[in-house]
C-alpha cells in the first residue's frame, strides 16, 4: 500500500525525533509500496505501510551487513 506525501512527512518527522537525528530523510521509491530511509544521504533501510483490520502501521526494515560491523575487542571474546 503506497504512502501518501503527508504520511512520508509524518513518518520522517517521527524517525528524526525518535533517533534525535535531523539527517534522516525518506525518499519515495518507484515501486510505490515503500519509501527508502537515508541518513546523511546513505541508504539504511525501507519503511513499509501496512493496513490490517482498519489500523495502519509502518514497519522500518534495516539490514546490517556483517562486514560493516566493528571488530570485537579482545576483552569481549572471553
Segments predicted by a language model, with ranges:
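Terminal leader/tail segments of proteins
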Residues: 1-78
Amino acid at each position: 500500500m503506497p504512502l501518501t506525501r503527508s504520511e512520508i512527512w509524518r513518518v520522517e518527522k517521527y524517525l528524526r525525533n525518535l533517533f534525535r537525528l535531523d539527517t534522516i530523510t525518506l525518499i519515495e521509491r518507484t515501486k510505490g509500496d515503500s519509501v527508502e530511509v537515508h541518513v546523511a544521504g546513505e541508504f539504511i533501510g525501507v519503511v513499509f505501510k501496512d493496513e490490517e483490520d482498519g489500523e495502519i502501521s509502518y514497519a522500518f526494515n534495516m539490514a546490517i551487513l556483517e562486514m560493516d560491523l566493528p571488530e570485537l575487542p579482545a576483552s569481549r571474546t572471553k
